[in-house]
From Swiss-Prot:
UniProt-listed Enzyme Commission number(s): 3.5.1.126
Record keywords: Hydrolase, Protease, Zymogen
Name of the protein: Oxamate amidohydrolase proenzyme
Organism of origin: Klebsiella pneumoniae subsp. pneumoniae (strain ATCC 700721 / MGH 78578)
Entry-linked PANTHER family: GAMMA-GLUTAMYLTRANSPEPTIDASE, GAMMA-GLUTAMYLTRANSPEPTIDASE (AFU_ORTHOLOGUE AFUA_4G13580)
Gene encoding the protein: hpxW
Site (Important for catalytic activity): 360
Amino acid sequence: MHSSNVSTHGMAVAPHHLASQSALAILREGGSAIEAMVAAAAAIAVVYPHMNGLGGDGFWLIVPPEGDPIAIDASGAAGSLATLEAYAGQRHIPNRGPQAALTVAGTVSGWVEALRISRDLTGRALPVARLLADAIGYAEDGIPVTASQAHATASKLEELRHQPGFSETWLVAGEAPRPGSRFRQPALAGTLRMLASDGLDSFYRGPLAERLAQGMAALGMPITLGDLQAHRARRPGPLTLQHQQGTLWNLAPPTQGLVSLAILGITDRLKMADADDAQTVHRIVEATKRAFALRDAHITDPRHLDVDVQQLLTPEALQPLADSIDDASASPWGGGKGPGDTVWMGVVDNSGLAVSFIQSIYHEFGSGVVLPDTGIVWQNRGAAFSLDPQHLLALAPGKQPFHTLNPAAARLNDGRVMVYGSMGGDGQPQTQAALFTRYILQGVPLQESISRPRWLLGRTWGQSSDSLKLEGRFAPACIARLRELGHDVEVLADFSEAMGHAGAIVRHPNGLLEGATDPRSNGAAAGY
């Protein structure tokens, strides 16, 4: 799959084709890219339920045809009952169960804030009920189970089947659903109908919020109704990198947007255009190690930062990191942050308004906890907190956890505008770097830049080792060379879902829209 889809009026890219089609339908009805993205976000919460959902977080990067981008941080903070004392006697926060479900789910608040921006930009609005219609229909009528959902359910079954509400919601006769079977989510359909009738804000302030809070209390989750009511999405200023090819943007802390920009800022000072595969992988991997070190030293709740993160992206900060890379030897590597189940999606409309968006519940099926009578599986993003009170990521009520999520965008010197991203924990910034380097610097066609074999340093969902993982389609000589350089290479399948689900849309100066999706996903680039 090496040919991009090209359209003239609108383009939507998602890792599930039904979400792409939901966005496209809104574009055809005259909706904005933002409204189309809300429709896609709701749809994919239903059709890719192991990856994301209403019980997760979201981040937006909205790029208008002219002017600065607008970022939305729709991530939730730790609940008011999530104290260090509440976890006394434990070495770390559990990855599953009610104690893992300790942060407010923010993604729906991001939909609210994004639609407010859409109205401000366009002066019009489609009804929320229209934006949620496809999602409601898929939840009621059933979705075709993907191989990805079936595999995620089966592989994590023993650690999840006893979590509250999991078996009743996600299993069929006590087992993982079969790929290609029809899977219904009636409780989630009811929740979506409430949001359509009462408004999206009812998730935090209304009858739905009260239902959620009652379920949380019954399950022993450390989130209260007051925590839901206090939550609002925020609009932080995005991080900016001045690259030789143009201006790049990503999200500020608590995300690892710094990592994605730092990798490209470091490699911008290396000779990437003519690098062969082994050199490309080696240099980006070495830049990744240095960017991860910045992340691990600094990134936390933005109210607790000890540095101006934007200053870490200046030429003065990046040049020494580039100079420290040895083309003949791999540097030591200490390990990554871990997995992340996520979806990235992009939409560009006829006006040139572009959206880069990411939505996640962290691990596969998040905490595994499904709130009673809602069909909502709650995220376990709070597992990223530390129980060490001196740690940068120490747990505290009202504190935001670290996020791997980071949607990217670029406005290039030649007039192209690009939104791009990927799911995949530690792999997200690496995949962004691979895509940008191949397409922008090395002249590889957009779709081929995503389809070509990829690599991953560290861990992502489905993987627990910290090795340098390569897809098996890399040439044997490339794999051998990377081992000679000192990398701990592990070869995976030819097309491995561990590499994430990437996507991109490019708006060309002539107005044509080019979309590419990942053959590792169930996605589509849908345009008209």
